A protein has these predicted regions:
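C-terminal segment of classical bacterial N-terminal signal peptides
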Residues: 1-5
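Low-complexity repeat regions of mature extracellularly deployed or surface/particle-associated proteins
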Residues: 6-214
Length: 214
């Protein structure tokens, strides 16, 4: 009988203009682990991570002025935790473009941007690319201008979104499109300028709560 094998990658990098590509194919693989994130500190970072398989862990912490992250996850029961500006180093993740695409069931995804200091500009997308069920997605974005777009296809999914910060003249924007049944969506959006939430849903047994404050 053969035991289950896993690949582990730990990244600790300091410096400008990083271009990092990681691909893991298999199960029980890790980039960082459940308690310690891989970390990058620098003025500019482009990160592309693909994980294929079940029960993988991806925990990554980025601090820098400009950050582009692309994360693709295919499989079930994966734990994804993407952090930006946990320590407030090096311009506090000023301009952020983040894209997370998942295909699979029972995944847990956390996206946290501007944890210590507001991010200046954030454009983030989270896409469920198939009929994906029983996923939990939490996104917390603190920033001056945030655009978050979520596209969901599947049943029994839970979405927890918190967007705050002063906002610029355009405020914050949240666009949510969902096809499927049994959805729990909680949106908290705040800022001193105009904020917009657009939700389009199709399916039964949806529980949607939206809170907007200046």
């Amino acid at each position: 009988m053969f035991g289950a094998h896993a690949n582990d990658i730990y990244v600790t990098q300091s410096g400008d203009d990083l271009d990092l590509d990681i691909t893991q194919d298999g199960q029980n693989n890790q980039v960082g682990n459940s308690t310690t994130a891989s970390s990058v500190i620098g003025a500019s970072a482009t990160i592309d991570i693909d994980q294929v398989g079940n029960s993988n862990v991806l925990k990554f912490d980025v601090n820098g002025a400009n950050y582009t992250g692309t994360f693709n996850v295919t499989g079930n029961s994966n734990d994804i935790d993407i952090l930006c500006d946990s320590t407030g180093n090096n311009s506090s993740c000023g301009t952020v473009t983040a894209s997370i695409t998942m295909v699979g069931n029972s995944n847990d995804i956390d996206l946290d941007i501007g944890e210590t200091t507001d991010a200046s500009n954030t454009t983030a997308t989270i896409t469920s690319a198939g009929s994906d069920d029983s996923n939990v997605v939490a996104a917390t974005i603190d920033g001056v201008s945030a655009i978050l777009t979520i596209t969901v296809d599947g049943d029994t999914n839970n979405w927890l979104l918190d967007i705050d910060g002063d906002g610029d003249v355009n405020g914050h924007t949240y666009i949510h499109t969902h096809t499927g049944g049994i959805a729990d969506v909680d949106v908290v959006q705040s800022g001193i300028y105009d904020n917009m939430v657009t939700i389009t849903t199709s399916g039964d047994n949806h529980d949607i709560d939206i809170s907007q404050t200046d």
